[in-house]
């Protein structure tokens, strides 16, 4: 079965009670102000069709979903051995901002989708790009076909004011020789990436390349190679949802990436990308209603990569 507006609308109504069950991220003050009852879903097919329900057009802070975009940019700038010598490909099983594992593993982050891994990727972008923050913004605008997408400067400033732990992660990696630039400028870029403000529709369109062997459905241009697309989806399936990746694979069965802003993107390779948003989170930092919505959609349209 194909996804339809009626299917999405029925799922939204079914999962709506969960919006009052989770907890909105409060360690970033600007995120804590987002109403917990927001709920949206968008599907973007490889034929270019957009199907939506709920608050799918409303922009929100994409947070860690941006880590996939940073990795995609880095894949185009570095040879695989260069890239993967500085960050691993394994699930962490720890909190996304853990220092303990990083210390034990001598400054090499487990994967690019936890904070340490994404900060290393931003360090790598800083080494190869003259203006990485502007390049990322142009990249997202191009992939989505939406030139008005921007950074939420209030969120970025809020994160920078509460950046002690991420700074500690960066300095710890630098002490092991796995950080090559000044810490503060790299953190500024990292927080701006997290503060990208996008809607479910914009996210689903942006990540269409992961459902289409590395080619953007929006632009028709090759973003990454088919092999890199497959590898990225493999990492999303194993590492994309913090320490809830196994639960998500079990329930939803799609490569995915979440953010503490309540967004999740999911990929059905060869067919479609899906974006959901509901700010109330579970204990792993993943959207409670969003995960359930994706689980129901996967069941109703009969899709899973497994």
Swiss-Prot record:
<feature type="binding site">
    <location>
        <position position="115"/>
    </location>
    <ligand>
        <name>substrate</name>
    </ligand>
</feature>
<dbReference type="GO" id="GO:0006537">
    <property type="term" value="P:glutamate biosynthetic process"/>
</dbReference>
<feature type="binding site">
    <location>
        <position position="260"/>
    </location>
    <ligand>
        <name>substrate</name>
    </ligand>
</feature>
<dbReference type="InterPro" id="IPR015868">
    <property type="entry name" value="Glutaminase"/>
</dbReference>
<dbReference type="Pfam" id="PF04960">
    <property type="entry name" value="Glutaminase"/>
</dbReference>
<feature type="binding site">
    <location>
        <position position="159"/>
    </location>
    <ligand>
        <name>substrate</name>
    </ligand>
</feature>
<feature type="binding site">
    <location>
        <position position="242"/>
    </location>
    <ligand>
        <name>substrate</name>
    </ligand>
</feature>
<feature type="binding site">
    <location>
        <position position="166"/>
    </location>
    <ligand>
        <name>substrate</name>
    </ligand>
</feature>
<protein>
    <recommendedName>
        <fullName>Glutaminase</fullName>
        <ecNumber>3.5.1.2</ecNumber>
    </recommendedName>
</protein>
<keyword id="KW-0378">Hydrolase</keyword>
<feature type="binding site">
    <location>
        <position position="64"/>
    </location>
    <ligand>
        <name>substrate</name>
    </ligand>
</feature>
<comment type="similarity">
    <text>Belongs to the glutaminase family.</text>
</comment>
<comment type="subunit">
    <text>Homotetramer.</text>
</comment>
<dbReference type="InterPro" id="IPR012338">
    <property type="entry name" value="Beta-lactam/transpept-like"/>
</dbReference>
<dbReference type="GO" id="GO:0004359">
    <property type="term" value="F:glutaminase activity"/>
</dbReference>
<feature type="binding site">
    <location>
        <position position="190"/>
    </location>
    <ligand>
        <name>substrate</name>
    </ligand>
</feature>
<dbReference type="GO" id="GO:0006543">
    <property type="term" value="P:glutamine catabolic process"/>
</dbReference>
